Amino acid sequence: MPGAASIVAVLAALLPTALGQANQSYVDYNIEANPDLFSECLETGGTSFPDCESGPLSKTLVCDTSAKPHDRAAALVSLLTFEELVNNTANTGHGAPRIGLPAYQVWNEALHGVAHADFSDAGDFSWSTSFPQPISTMAALNRTLIHQIATIISTQGRAFMNAGRYGLDVYSPNINTFRHPVWGRGQETPGEDAYCLASTYAYEYITGIQGGVDANPLKLIATAKHYAGYDIENWDNHSRLGNDMQITQQDLAEYYTPQFLVASRDAKVHSVMCSYNAVNGVPSCSNSFFLQTLLRDTFDFVEDGYVSGDCGAVYNVFNPHGYATNESSAAADSIRAGTDIDCGVSYPRHFQESFHDQEVSRQDLERGVTRLYASLIRAGYFDGKTSPYRNITWSDVVSTNAQNLSYEAAAQSIVLLKNDGILPLTTSSSTKTIALIGPWANATTQMLGNYYGPAPYLISPLQAFQDSEYKITYTIGTNTTTDPDSTSQSTALTTAKEADLIIFAGGIDNTLETEAQDRSNITWPSNQLSLITKLADLGKPLIVLQMGGGQVDSSALKNNKNVNALIWGGYPGQSGGQALADIITGKRAPAARLVTTQYPAEYAEVFPAIDMNLRPNGSNPGQTYMWYTGTPVYEFGHGLFYTNFTASASAGSGTKNRTSFNIDEVLGRPHPGYKLVEQMPLLNFTVDVKNTGDRVSDYTAMAFVNTTAGPAPHPNKWLVGFDRLSAVEPGSAKTMVIPVTVDSLARTDEEGNRVLYPGRYEVALNNEREVVLGFTLTGEKAVLFKWPKEEQLIAPQ
């Protein structure tokens, strides 16, 4: 089994570096890493279950499964001395040996597979399935796939937990939006759309991890992160640890938080992570408006759900934010604002001082620890061996359909950007020898992105093609940003000249985009583009694979007629090489679509990444497909097929879909099965899709709404739904139904309220607007969601 880099080692190297990044837009705080933080904070997960059969806790209320989770947790916490209480306020909880409470590690990772676990060196528990990164999975436009992946991750996580190698909660999913293309962690997200994509991903992932909505017991505890307004690492020396992001109420409500509303209200996530950055002057982890007014009072966060600080974020409230006068006050401000658990050591190292200075009370600490243990109780932590999920073992990891699903997810996620007809390759063609060139040609762990555990196997493109019917010649040609030696490109050209067809596998990787590292530009690395141009000049058939999570400006390749095909492969996971080879050779047909905009390079050169305003103004050309006023290289939602599809309004759609709706009547309807009337479909956008080509293929679609209703400026369009039809045979047709909810038609006003405006609306199929359904909303405008007044309940100390 190919080895994978230890996530612990990666994070240990990464996080202190991140803490040391200076923020040149602020006072020079001379930021240094908290010297006490990482040795304890980074301990890998794993714990034993409390003994509720014969241990000291067995006769207490916490082991009484008939009692309410809150009461059980409160009873446990009441048994702790103040010192024991303090020692359980961080991610590395010490437990309380005196009463038989084991130590517990809150920090476990599950971004696209089990990670930050206590993996064995070989044999059982030595690996976990590594699925594609979320940016790739979302491109498949298959919500069922997201749920299936999360379900398998939770099964594997439970097996590790039952073996004492993992915890019951995970620091996933990352549901921030990929707003600016330079962001290093965009690969971890579902793309640039908040209302539809990020919210759908949040719902499907969280319910898959937790075992459903209102699951009892919870399978695992998901953590929605990073709340809120976090989408920059170190762009232009603006450190994520000290950034104060200026966000209007309108943008905060419309773009930076709706996915957290869905995660809390609809998916019933049991944990939320507050982010490093500040918003409008207040660090997120000491922001009572975020953590109490919005999350608990407005977003309907579950009772006793807990908030964890990002790792070191409580310390950052003091340094570099300077919001608190010292680390002790930073800890006090954060716990009182609503950060229940500190991923770090500011809480356990400083609460004695905070308590002595009367900045916190025992009740403040008890509230946070009670919330953590109430969630663990809901996950069966104190329920004994007969509790559901306690019988999941390594055999369940091995026997799940995980490896097949990992391949399926990779194959479904690959986007065909350009094709002049060269693809798919066929065995009847004259192509016998393929030159495989580039820094991704023999990629292994490179395909996993970040936050991964050791995979059971890694299939590179080279390995996959070597197992095909083609003769493969391989040379790297160039690395990601530099040539390995002075002759590497000339060697690649010689190899290419002797082949019938060339595949260049390149793009960007975690040497350019990752946590704590943004890109400085969105161009192809010059060394790679130079080699691609030389390969194109040979006049041989040339296929280019653009890999990595963030987009690069591929206009030179799009416009070069000697580049016959261009594929975006993202981070496709452990089976990525096989999926790419199968797409190229026609064993699978591409159907994915971009979930980010591919901007021209000038966009990142002239528009600062710290400008959080979505709407165009002055030098701001507008951000995301909703507001961008320029011409993208490839649009959000772009993706080609190997076959031809036609789409038409479904027969009878004119009667099924009314063309006029009165707002008062719509909002006055009964809504059985829905918590809120605005969650109901106003109409079903129904289209018939026919495969008029000669290849079986999946079909994906996005439904966009546009309107001039409400105040200017008006968005270009916005996404209200998507779907994927599987295996549409040549000559056959299938019907696609995309519900368009009442809420999806609302816009956000300057106060942050979601408002349904009267006027003319259109729902259109894909960017090409193959099918357009027009309708009118009549009557008076109506506020569907009232944004609360922004004020801090807790003053800084």
From Swiss-Prot:
It catalyses: Hydrolysis of (1->4)-beta-D-xylans, to remove successive D-xylose residues from the non-reducing termini. Residues 1-20 form the signal peptide. It is found in: Secreted. Gene3D superfamilies: Glycoside hydrolase family 3 C-terminal domain, Glycoside hydrolase, family 3, N-terminal domain, Immunoglobulins. One of its GO terms (biological process) is xylan catabolic process. InterPro entries: BXL, Fn3-like, Glyco_hydro_3_C, Glyco_hydro_3_C_sf, Glyco_hydro_3_N, Glyco_hydro_3_N_sf, Glycoside_hydrolase_SF, Ig-like_fold. This is Probable exo-1,4-beta-xylosidase xlnD. The gene is xlnD.
